[in-house]
Amino acid sequence: MNKLLLLIILTLALSPPTTWAQAGHEYSALVEKTVNYKSWSLVGLKTDKPEDLRSLIVGKKLVMVVYFAPWCGNWRNEAPIAAKLYEKYKDQGFQVIGVSEYASRDDVRKYFGEAGPPYPIVTESESRDDKQKTPHYGYRQLTGDSRNWGSPWNIFLEPSKLNATGDLLTEKAWVVNGELIEDEVDKFIGSKVAATTAGAIEPCKN
């Protein structure tokens, strides 16, 4: 029995810490965190003009802002999932906005190819040297993201609950410090974009 126990311990010690890490993923749970998220105006990839966040989210029920580096393998894992969720819920008031980091705008365009991105993309930084200077880095520190580059990093905003004026949009928000867990986030989005009010009930008439 002691030999069997020793064999089990050695096997566990030599195994990868998680199957996610072994598969090259950095999945993270959806959690509510204090983030002190601020509004921004950043240059759009398609328009080459400043795009204001408040304008981009008008009329939406839920918005996922995803910060990413186009060269990052974990972002490339998440990108098809983000596009899939956007396609599924966009007609129900869901919006995705991508914020590119640590790569040139030309590199971002090359990543998305001739078809271009399926949702709006804006640029916050264009050099890896900017890593510790970006708002993205600051938000990651507040939410406990200890990864090196923090790509992807996802934050969910509910426009109806955001501050109507001022730079600060919200103190708290739901975030994912890594790749989305598709089933979990799918359910979350579905619950947020579902009708919040039931139709009026007509009383019975005799």
Predicted regions and their residues:
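Thiol/disulfide oxidoreductase modules built on the thioredoxin-like
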Residues: A115-P117, S127-F188
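Second-shell loop/turn segments in exported
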Residues: Y67-W71, I97-G98, W174-V175
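Conserved redox-active cysteine motifs that mediate thiol-disulfide chemistry
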Residues: Y67-K84
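N-terminal targeting signals for export/organelle localization
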Residues: M1-L45, A195-A198, E202-N206
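A short beta-strand-turn-helix
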Residues: Y37-V63
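Hydrophobic beta-strand anchors of alpha/beta hydrolase catalytic cores
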Residues: M64-V65, V96, N154
